[in-house]
Amino acid sequence: MSKRNPPVTNIADLVSDSSLDEDSLSFLEELQDPELYFKNDTFSSKSSHSDGTVTGDTLRRQSSGATALERLVSHPRTKNFDLQGNGGQNSALKEVNTPAYQSMHHFEHLITPLPSTNASHSEVSLSAGVNDLNSNSEHDLLPKSVNKTPGSLSISRRRRIGRIGLGPPKRAEYTLTDPSKTSDTKNSTEADEDIEMKSREVSPASNSVAATTLKPLQLHNTPLQTSQEHPKPSFHPSQFESSFSPRVQFDHDVERRASELHSRPVTVFQEPQRSASQPYESHALSPKVAPLFDNSQATPIPKRQQDVVTVANLQFIKLGVVGKGGSSMVYRIFSPDNSRLYALKEVNFINADQTTIQGYKNEIALLRKLSGNDRIIKLYAAEVNDTLGQLNMVMECGETDLANLLMKNMKKPINLNFIRMYWEQMLEAVQVVHDQNIVHSDLKPANFLLVEGNLKLIDFGIAKAIGNDTTNIHRDSHIGTINYMAPEALTDMNAHTNSGVKLVKLGRPSDVWSLGCILYQMVYGRAPFAHLKMIQAIAAIPNEQYHIHFPEVALPANAVQEKEGSLPGVTVGPDLMDVMKRCLERDQRKRLTIPELLVHPFLNPLPSYLTPLAKKPLPVSGHTNNAHPLRLSTEISASQLSMIIERSVELSKHKRLNKELIDSMAYDCVSNLRKMPE
């Protein structure tokens, strides 16, 4: 750094001192600036200042209306610094237009070039000047260590000759100390302090402008860093907006709100504390449903104590009613031990007679006897309380029964595969009962439960075992369903007993009649006598003069014919028609048995290529055109059959035999295989 006195940047302060002379301004010669020279008590320059002190080619007086911010920016050591912390030339603070400033050129320069040294010291002076700009006490701004001798540059007394507005004074004096008597450090320090002191001499009007403009700068508590030796401090995230978007002037309310916003502490969102029993809530979850159990307990306990039921020392929890009938209720229950669902049948027989009570107990005995079969509902636990008159049975839980399934599909065309599958499962269930010499005597769609896609027989309330020496059972009453009741169950076919009580004779054929009524409903959508009233049905069922109608086309319920031949019906095949007619024979001796129904062609349909050929003329060699194809009736072995098949395939490839003849030969081969002993 070259040894020189501090530069003079404020001509208004320069001319206010009467001690100013040409010798005192000799320090300007050290600048060695060819563009700057002294002439007629004024400074002339080919450049102009950005603070309004020099415009054009003449250095003019700075008006008292200039703001302290403008004079601060005009200082050569702060020229390249943005007061918001940005060192660019695009700062909005350089474009302050006041009445004392009128730009005459497109570019502006300072009188004194920016020194290359003491940069860090200038930063301290600038920071101090910005932070203490609004102070009204000049005495408090002077440091105590400053030399207060009259010859000192930093505290030289300024005397003003004339008044502002009357033109420039004729002469001004400024007393300077001898540069040789002061060290470089002292001169630099005093120069900075002098610039700092001069920047504070502003009018009251400019005080308000500077305070309003520079107050947001108080958010930055760290001094400006421009030296490469000192790293730049980190900014608070809230200061980024003000750093990149400096504002010169704004309303006082905006200033106050901005100050409150930056001074407000940052609130970090914390999830509210939740107790252990409080359920977790989320907007994406379904609506709240009252929990079935109390989660705070180790063992699930229902909300209502009356929902707990104990059967055979096993606890269950009621979930809802499945069905009801007469004096019985069926519930869906839950077992906490294995987390499975069951069905609970509760029967109240407090007002029932002994015959009814014995029938309920007989059902438990039959279920235990038939337990383990896949076609019979499983009984897990049961108990009878004669004191309370209550019977409880825990059984296998199903999805629905056959009655609901048929009602759901009654308006749709029948599906023969659907009928064939469930008809076979019903026959197998009844076969299990008959093999144990038991007659169910109350078969109906509601007594077949659908469990995991398979039908199972339930409700043995009126079932009774058959004696070993008889084929029928005798009951003193029958409480089955009328639409599925056999004719013999409605006819007094037995003599009076010694006690005068009429007996009803029932056997296995009565269950076959009931099965025939169920099959009829599966095909046509209703039972054979369901369209009649009860009195009419009771009279029509045993009456042989009343013919049961078997349509050849099965129509869905409530089918409407839009045009001729457009009904959505399904043709009933001859095998299905034969099964229904053979099951609904009024003479029970003519009805098919369960084993015969299981091997009926309806359940064992032959492929189309194995069905008997229609009687039509076929061109076969050695026969007339009106003759039927030759049927092979001789018994053959398996090897011979294999040779015939191979020969037939070979001939068919050469198109020597037609398809009808090959089918006929294959049918005869299969027929002969059936006749061969196993």
UniProtKB/Swiss-Prot annotation:
Chain intervals with Polar residues compositional bias: 41-66, 114-125
Keywords from the named record: ATP-binding, Cell cycle, Cell division, Kinase, Mitosis, Nucleotide-binding, Serine/threonine-protein kinase, Transferase
Enzyme class: transferase
Binding site for ATP: V322, G323, K324, G325, G326, S327, S328, M329, V330, K345
Pfam families for the chain: Pkinase (PF00069)
Catalytic activity reported: L-seryl-[protein] + ATP = O-phospho-L-seryl-[protein] + ADP + H(+); L-threonyl-[protein] + ATP = O-phospho-L-threonyl-[protein] + ADP + H(+); L-tyrosyl-[protein] + ATP = O-phospho-L-tyrosyl-[protein] + ADP + H(+)
Gene Ontology MF term list: ATP binding; protein serine kinase activity; protein serine/threonine kinase activity; protein serine/threonine/tyrosine kinase activity; protein tyrosine kinase activity
Protein name: Serine/threonine-protein kinase mph1
SUPFAM superfamilies: Protein kinase-like (PK-like)
Active-site positions on this chain: D442 (proton acceptor)
Residue span(s) of domain Protein kinase: 316-607
GO BP terms: cell division; chromosome segregation; meiosis I; meiotic centromeric cohesion protection in anaphase I; meiotic spindle assembly checkpoint signaling; mitotic spindle assembly checkpoint signaling; protein localization to kinetochore
InterPro entries: Kinase-like_dom_sf (IPR011009), Mps1_cat (IPR027084), Prot_kinase_dom (IPR000719), Protein_kinase_ATP_BS (IPR017441), Ser/Thr_kinase_AS (IPR008271)
Disruption phenotype: Leads to chromosome segregation defects. Sensitive to thiabendazole (TBZ).
Lineage of origin: Eukaryota, Fungi, Dikarya, Ascomycota, Taphrinomycotina
Biological source species: Schizosaccharomyces pombe (strain 972 / ATCC 24843)
SMART domains found in the cross-reference section: S_TKc
ATP-binding recorded as keyword: yes
Protein family (similarity comment): Belongs to the protein kinase superfamily. Ser/Thr protein kinase family.
Family annotation (PROSITE patterns): PROTEIN_KINASE_ATP, PROTEIN_KINASE_DOM, PROTEIN_KINASE_ST
Known EC number: 2.7.12.1
Function: Involved in mitotic spindle assembly checkpoint signaling, a process that delays anaphase until chromosomes are bioriented on the spindle, and in the repair of incorrect mitotic kinetochore-spindle microtubule attachments. Phosphorylates spc7/knl1 on MELT motifs; phosphorylation is required for recruitment of the BUB1-BUB3 complex to kinetochores.
Entry GO CC: cytosol; kinetochore; nucleus
Region annotation (Disordered) ranges: 39-93, 114-209
UniProt KW Cytoplasm keyword: no
